[in-house]
Amino acid sequence: MTKQTLSFQAEVAQLLHLVTHSLYSNKEIFLRELISNASDACDKLRYEAINDSGLYEDAPTLEVRVSFDPAAKTLTISDNGIGMSAQEAIDHLGTIAKSGTKDFVSKLSGDQKADSQLIGQFGVGFYSGFIVADKITVESRRAGMKASEGVRWISGGAGDFEVETIERAARGTSVILHLRDDAMDYCSAWKLKSIINKYSDHISLPILMEKEEWKDGELINPSDEKGGRQPGGMVKTGEWETVNKGNAIWARAKKDITPEQYTEFYKQISHDFEAPLAYTHNRVEGSTEYTQLLYLPSKAPMDLFNREKSAGVKLYVKRVFIMDDAEALLPTYLRFVKGVVDSADLPLNVSRELLQESRDVKAIREGCTKRVLGMLEDLAKHDKLPAPSADGGTDTTAGVSDVLSEEDKANEGKYSKFYAEFGAVLKEGLGEDYANKDRLAKLLRFASSSTDTVSVSFADYKARMKEGQEAIYYITADTPAAAKNSPQLEVFKKKGIEVLLMTDRVDEWALNYLQEFDGTPLQSVAKGAVDLGKLQDEAEKKAAEEAAETFKPLLAKLKEALKDKAEDVRVTTRLVDSPACLVVQDHGMSTQLARMLKQAGQAAPDVKPVLEVNAEHPLVKKLDGSVHFNDLAHILFDQALLAEGGLPADPAAYVKRVNALLV
């Protein structure tokens, strides 16, 4: 391949600009990122070589080398891992293959501090080299390819890069950073070693640097042995030494690992700048033996709701890396969890297909799921914010609390923070994980009609139900305001009955799998006829029956006028101030869920709701004798639709009818 000049993907160009201008406060993370990439490349070679040992060529010992040259102003990170072909260099270094990239770029504000945090949350990997370099040269050869098929990639971090074929005998990749003048302090063995010890000490591969020793300066006067000397300095000996412990952190005893080391390992595997919210480290022995080190992030990634995204758990077998995104190790609703699972029982050549079928993997999955749920239960118990926690469940994860913290204060508010970030995806578990459905239900939190500030669990709600109340009432809506001001809540507010307000897109789908909590049924206030049971007195019931009989002719006329829109029309006792509202049958799909499915491009049935009218409202009383009956009937229906967050099927016709009545 002759030298080519190619353009970066648009998102990469913007990211590079921000990397060079926003991450000034924590420059040294570039070394962590590049060493992590080098380690991953060696892990991938080790995995591919399971089926083809020839890929090791004449260098079976995998390692990462860090070297510097003050005269040339370069810092080089090399590995003898899998390497890259020319096309792979173009694909991997010229584009960002991560999902959510455009979403990421759209959220960048230009505020350096805010963008720095956002970039850290996204993870910049290789591009972090431009924090300290004004040019990067990458030389690589893929394992198994000829020496003549090496590749050189060069970029100054602007809008384009050069790529050409070179002769390269060594397998693997060298990333050569051409340092900026203000980054020359990274040409210091002491500084580089301190950064490696801080961020990459746990890398299981040896990280090598050239050994240095002190050398006195030359005599100013060679004939005077006792005279003065030129300044001495450290000089390279030509030997290489290992500068990291090279011990996988999860294989060490918990007592030998500091919280800071746990945090740095999390940052290395997740490429997150923020510390994790909580973690759990455990070795499981028995019929299936494995070690798990699992983390809860502090912030949700931008692609959290992409169910096809890569999982966050790395799989090792006897400390040999197998795969990055082992989705079989945790259910999809826990896709936000990061960490490592190291199995002693799986074969080294395990495939994704085998993972789906393996009994050992099933046991690991169940164990990891219980461990994560136990961690969440522990956080919920110790959450001292005003939001009460669901209590009464059994924490089957022994020892989690001592992993998290000995002090309740250390966990104060953590569950509330977790739930604000990940609560919506946790609800997916109701439909995916039947075995843990009850545990998940205790972890859910919702807004309430009784308070503007406190999130409420099902257990909290049940503990303060009114005497004679037979159900947990809830409403689903597009927004908190739409839920709180919904006409369907009017009678509940009048009687002081609490209603849970559910506004996550997943809520209605999830509650299809949860019909009751601790023996108490869940009842949507927007489905079926309102039945308050013992909370409705006999006088109210009698008045409702009489109104239904009195209004029979009017209801028949309304039903005829709205036959294309409404399944039925009936008198209701649920309304106090509003003239009408829409509900669906007990087991029908709500209009909100139908709208959501259609917006997502999925097939959804046309829902014909039931129109319920308030017999005491002046507008309803006026209907029967009005010459504008037909227009008023349609306006009544469309206003009820608007009140629940929907839109009239024909907005222009609605406006025309309203205007006609106004003049």
UniProtKB/Swiss-Prot annotation:
Residues 218-228 have a biased composition (Basic and acidic residues). It comes from the Bacteria. Residues 596-663 are annotated as: C. GO terms for cellular component: cytoplasm. Residues 1-352 are annotated as: A. InterPro entries: HATPase_C_sf, Heat_shock_protein_90_CS, HSP90_C, Hsp90_fam, Hsp90_N, Ribosomal_Su5_D2-typ_SF. Keywords: ATP-binding, Chaperone, Cytoplasm, Nucleotide-binding, Stress response. Residues 353-595 are annotated as: B. Its main location: cytoplasm. It is found in: Cytoplasm. PROSITE patterns: HSP90 (PS00298). One of its GO terms (molecular function) is unfolded protein binding. Residues 218-237 are annotated as: Disordered. Pfam families: HATPase_c_3 (PF13589), HSP90 (PF00183). Homodimer. Molecular chaperone. Has ATPase activity. Belongs to the heat shock protein 90 family. This is Chaperone protein HtpG. It comes from Albidiferax ferrireducens (strain ATCC BAA-621 / DSM 15236 / T118) (Rhodoferax ferrireducens).
